[in-house]
Amino acid sequence: MSTCGDNSKIFQDIQNFIQDYDLNKDYSVTSSEIYQSFLKKMNGDSLKASQAAGVLCSTVDMDNDGKFSYYEISKYCADQAKKQIEQNAETAALADVEALLLRLDKDKDKKLNKTEFVKFFKEQGYNPYSDPDYVLKIIDLDKDGYVSASELQEWFKQKRLAYARGPIC
């Protein structure tokens, strides 16, 4: 998922896509131009070019007018980025947890006690006037007073998924 600072890169990528595939330079990309571009890139293999163009057009051309608008391309890119984040959320959350436990789990029991959790809480930049006990209760799903690796993993995963569903800017 992109942040506001990344939007200029996304904008540039979309502009480059339009420039690359807009063969007649009319500032729109048609399904025919996509096919012609793919045909060239696929060394004249019309079947592969047709299939690839068909998939792309059916996926990106939301209003089925045979053209790719800037909105359609950017929506497609944003949707793909969200899907990628969702697919990687579990793995990334596990990596986050492993790194966190290596750093904060002083007694190496693969869970954070209250002291360890408060340190994590402060490192995350939470408001110092917030109640770490309250946050601990939210993350501590089994209510045993500790935050286990699996509870941390679920929390990190949910944060990543929420980020993926949020607005680009």
UniProtKB/Swiss-Prot annotation:
Source organism superkingdom: Eukaryota
Keyword terms: Calcium, Metal-binding, Repeat
UniProt binding sites for Ca(2+) 2: D140, D142, D144, Y146, E151
One Pfam family here: EF-hand_7
SUPFAM superfamilies in the record: EF-hand
A GO term for molecular function: calcium ion binding
InterPro entries per UniProt: EF-hand-dom_pair, EF_Hand_1_Ca_BS, EF_hand_dom
Residues reported to bind Ca(2+) 1: D105, D107, D109, K111, E116
Entry-linked Gene3D superfamilies: EF-hand (1.10.238.10)
Gene Ontology terms: cellular component: cytosol; extracellular matrix
KW Metal-binding (keyword) present: yes
PROSITE patterns, per the entry: EF_HAND_1, EF_HAND_2
Keyword Isomerase set for record: no
Annotated EF-hand domain residues: 9-44, 60-83, 92-127, 133-162
Record-linked PANTHER family: CALCIUM-BINDING PROTEIN (PTHR10827:SF85), RETICULOCALBIN (PTHR10827)
Protein name: Calcium-binding protein G
